[in-house]
C-alpha cells in the first residue's frame, strides 16, 4: 500500500512516462526505501540513455517533498557538479563527506575517516564505476581503500543506507580490471543484503541521438563479447554524431568555442602525448596565445595536492583532474632547476578563487605528471635548504610546508585523456581515436570508446575516423 503510494509519488516527478525498466526500478526503489533492513544496499546500474538520471532526479525530488533526508555524492568535483545539475540538490565529493583532515599531526596520513552523524539518511552515489578500492594515495586518505571507507562510513550511521549508481560499460578505475563498486559479490563481502537492477531500455527521447545509438552498439558488443572486430558506427541520419577531417578540425573547434564556450568543449585523445599536441595547437592556432601561460588559460590538475586549499571549508584538497582557470599570472621564475609561476586561479567546479604556485615544467611533458626522477630531483634540491635542521623529522616537517615542494602540477585542459574526462560531460566532444590495428581491439578499447562517446551531451565529432569504423565500409 505505502509502497505503491511511494512509487506513484516518484512517477509523478518523472519528466516523461517511465519505461518498463524504470517501472521495475521504481518498485525496487520503493521496496528498498521502505524495508526494515538497515544493512541493505541498492545497486542501480544503467547504460547511457536509459534514464538513470531522470529516475534519481525524481527520487530526490520525492524524498524532499516527503521530508526525507538524502545526501548526494560523486567521486570527483566535476561529477558532483553534473549530479547536482540533474538531481536539483547539492552534491559533494565522496572524499569531502567521509574524511576529515587531521588537525595537528606529523603522520603521513592527512585525512582520517569522519564519523557519520546522520540519522535515517539515504546516501546516493553517482558515477560509482570510478570508485577504486586500491589507493594510489593510500597514505593520505583513511585506509587508502575508498570503497571500504565509503561503506564503513554510511553503515556506521543510525539507519543510513546506500544507493550506488553507475554504468558497467564505462572504464574501471585506473590500474583495475573492473569497477568494484558495481560488483554485487564485492558488495556482499561487506555483509550487506545487495539488491540490483540494470536499466537497458533506451528512453524514447534518445532514439534520434547518434551518440546514444552508437554507444548502445558498443555496449551490446561488450555484453555479447564481440569486441575483437572493428565496431561499425552509423553516421548517416544523425546530426549529433559526425566525422571531421584534419583540414576542418581547427575551424570546427573554433566554432564550438564561439557557439557554446570553451568550458563546454573538450578534445579527448588516447594518450597524454597526443593531448599535449592538441593543447599546443589549440593555444597557438585558435586562442593565439604566445606566452607559455596567459590569463584565461584552462589547466587541469595532474596530481592531488593537499597544501594550497588546506583548511578551506569548500575544498580541503585539490584533486587530480580538477579544472582551473588562470585569472592572472603574477610572476614566473626559475629556481632549483625548475620553472614556477605564481598565479591567481578559479576552480570551476567549486566557484572558488585563490592564489597558488604552479609548476610550468609539467605543461609540456608527455607523462601524466612530473616523472619520478624529476620529482626526486625537486625533493632533494629543496631539502638542501634545510641542511641546518638537525633531525630528519624536522626536515620533513619543513618540506610539508614548503610552497615549492608543494607546487601544483598542471597540464593544459583543452584536450585530455579519457580517464581524465570520466565523470565530466561537455556539449561538444572531439574524439581522436588515432591509429588502431586489429590487435589493439578488445574489451578495454570498447570500454574506452564507450566512455569517450558518453562524455558528449549535444555533439560528438570523430576526428580522422579510420574507415574500418564506418558501418558501410567494406570489412
Regions found by a protein language model. Give the residues of each.
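ASCE P-loop NTPase helicase motor core
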Residues: 26-27, 31, 36, 41-45, ...
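C-terminal accessory regions
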Residues: 335-475
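Conserved helicase motor core of P-loop NTPases
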Residues: 5, 29, 37, 154-160, ...
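Conserved SAM-binding loop
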Residues: 18, 72, 267
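Short, conserved phosphate/pyrophosphate- and ester-handling motifs at nucleotide-, phospho-/glycolipid
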Residues: 22, 76, 271, 423
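Short coil/loop residues immediately preceding or within conserved phosphate-binding loops
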Residues: 39, 321, 413
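Conserved pre-motif I regulatory segment
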Residues: 2-40
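Generic structural signal for buried aliphatic residues
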Residues: 25, 299, 324, 426-429
Amino acid at each position: 500500500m505505502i509502497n505503491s503510494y511511494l512509487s506513484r509519488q516518484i512517477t509523478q516527478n518523472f519528466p516523461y512516462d517511465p519505461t518498463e525498466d524504470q517501472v521495475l526500478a521504481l518498485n525496487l526503489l520503493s521496496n528498498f526505501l521502505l524495508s526494515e533492513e538497515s544493512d541493505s544496499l541498492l545497486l542501480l546500474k544503467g547504460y547511457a540513455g536509459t534514464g538513470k538520471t531522470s529516475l534519481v532526479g525524481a527520487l530526490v525530488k520525492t524524498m524532499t517533498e516527503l521530508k526525507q533526508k538524502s545526501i548526494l555524492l560523486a567521486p570527483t568535483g566535476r561529477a558532483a557538479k553534473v549530479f547536482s545539475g540533474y538531481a536539483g540538490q547539492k552534491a559533494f565529493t565522496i572524499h569531502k563527506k567521509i574524511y576529515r583532515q587531521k588537525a595537528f599531526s606529523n603522520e603521513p596520513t592527512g585525512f582520517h575517516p569522519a564519523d557519520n552523524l546522520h540519522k535515517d539518511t539515504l546516501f546516493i552515489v553517482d558515477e560509482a564505476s570510478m570508485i577504486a578500492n586500491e589507493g594510489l594515495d593510500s597514505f593520505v586518505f583513511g585506509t587508502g581503500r575508498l570503497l571500504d571507507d565509503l561503506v564503513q562510513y554510511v553503515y556506521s550511521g543510525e539507519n543510513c543506507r546506500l544507493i550506488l549508481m553507475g554504468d558497467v560499460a564505462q572504464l574501471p578505475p585506473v590500474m583495475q580490471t573492473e569497477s568494484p563498486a558495481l560488483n554485487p559479490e564485492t558488495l556482499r563481502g561487506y555483509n550487506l543484503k545487495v539488491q540490483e537492477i540494470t536499466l537497458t531500455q533506451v528512453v524514447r527521447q534518445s532514439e534520434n541521438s547518434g551518440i546514444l545509438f552508437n554507444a548502445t552498439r558498443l555496449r551490446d558488443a561488450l555484453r555479447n563479447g564481440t569486441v575483437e572486430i572493428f565496431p561499425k558506427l552509423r553516421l548517416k541520419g544523425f546530426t549529433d554524431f559526425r566525422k571531421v577531417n584534419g583540414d576542418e578540425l581547427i575551424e570546427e573547434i573554433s566554432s564550438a568555442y564561439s557557439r557554446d564556450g570553451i568550458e563546454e568543449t573538450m578534445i579527448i585523445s588516447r594518450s597524454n602525448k597526443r593531448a599535449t599536441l592538441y593543447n599546443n595547437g589549440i593555444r597557438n592556432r585558435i586562442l593565439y596565445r604566445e606566452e607559455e601561460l596567459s590569463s584565461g588559460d584552462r589547466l587541469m590538475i595532474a596530481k592531488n595536492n593537499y597544501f594550497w586549499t588546506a583548511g578551506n571549508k569548500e575544498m580541503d584538497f585539490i584533486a587530480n583532474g580538477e579544472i582551473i582557470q588562470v585569472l592572472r599570472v603574477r610572476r614566473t621564475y626559475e629556481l632549483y632547476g625548475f620553472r614556477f609561476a605564481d598565479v591567481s586561479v578559479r576552480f570551476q567546479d567549486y566557484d572558488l578563487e585563490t592564489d597558488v604556485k604552479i609548476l610550468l615544467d609539467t605543461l609540456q611533458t608527455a607523462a601524466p605528471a612530473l616523472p619520478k626522477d624529476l620529482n626526486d630531483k625537486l625533493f632533494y634540491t629543496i631539502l638542501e635548504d634545510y641542511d641546518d635542521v638537525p633531525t630528519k623529522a624536522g626536515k620533513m616537517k619543513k618540506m610539508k610546508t614548503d610552497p615549492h615542494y608543494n607546487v601544483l602540477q598542471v597540464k593544459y585542459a583543452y584536450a585530455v585523456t579519457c580517464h581524465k574526462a570520466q565523470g565530466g560531460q561537455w556539449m561538444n566532444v572531439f574524439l581522436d581515436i588515432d591509429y588502431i590495428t586489429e590487435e589493439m581491439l578488445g574489451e578495454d578499447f570498447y570500454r574506452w570508446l564507450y566512455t569517450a562517446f558518453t562524455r558528449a551531451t549535444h555533439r560528438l565529432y570523430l576526428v580522422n575516423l579510420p574507415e574500418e569504423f564506418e558501418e558501410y565500409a567494406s570489412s
